[in-house]
C-alpha cells in the first residue's frame, strides 16, 4: 500500500485511523492534541481512556495492528506489562491509552498546555479542530 505523501492529508488520515482503532475496542474520552507548536518530538498526541489495564493493552494492540495494516510505521510501545498507561509511538503521533485514575493523575491535557484558553489559541491559529464522530474532544 502506498500512502499519500501530502503531509496534511497523511497526518489527517493517520489521526483518523488511530481514533477508529481506539473506538473499535471501545476506548473512550478521546482527545486529539496538536502539539506541533509545543514540541519537535511529535505532531499530535492522542489520549484515550480504557476501563481496565486489560482493555488498555487491547486498545494499544489494535492501534498497532490497524496502523501497520495501513502501512504506517510503529516506532515502539511502552507500558504493556502494567497496562495502566500504554504508549504507542507512531513518530508523527504519540498515543496514550490510560485507565481513568492514571489519566486523571497525570492529566496530560493540562501538562501539555491544552487548557481551555490554550485550546482556543491553537484552534484559532490552526483552524477549528475537527472531531471524527462528535464525541472526540479536540484539544
Which sequence ranges carry the predicted segments?
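Compact, glycine-rich, soluble single-domain proteins
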Residues: 55-72, 87
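Long, contiguous binding/interaction regions
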Residues: 1-37, 51-58, 65, 79, ...
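Glycine/charge-rich, flexible interdomain linkers and switch-proximal surface loops
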Residues: 29-41, 75-92
Amino acid at each position: 500500500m502506498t500512502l499519500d505523501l501530502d503531509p496534511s492529508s497523511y497526518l489527517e488520515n493517520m489521526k483518523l485511523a488511530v481514533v477508529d482503532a481506539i473506538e473499535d475496542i471501545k476506548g473512550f474520552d478521546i482527545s486529539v492534541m496538536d502539539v506541533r507548536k509545543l514540541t519537535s518530538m511529535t505532531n499530535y498526541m492522542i489520549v484515550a481512556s480504557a476501563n481496565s489495564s486489560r482493555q488498555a493493552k487491547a486498545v494499544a494492540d489494535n492501534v498497532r495492528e490497524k496502523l501497520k495494516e495501513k502501512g504506517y510505521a510503529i516506532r515502539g510501545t511502552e507500558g504493556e506489562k502494567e497496562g495502566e498507561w500504554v504508549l504507542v509511538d507512531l513518530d508523527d503521533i504519540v498515543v496514550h491509552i490510560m485507565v481513568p485514575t492514571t489519566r486523571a493523575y497525570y492529566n496530560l491535557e493540562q501538562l501539555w498546555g491544552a487548557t481551555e484558553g490554550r485550546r482556543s489559541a491553537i484552534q484559532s491559529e490552526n483552524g477549528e479542530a475537527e472531531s471524527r464522530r462528535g464525541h472526540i474532544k479536540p484539544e
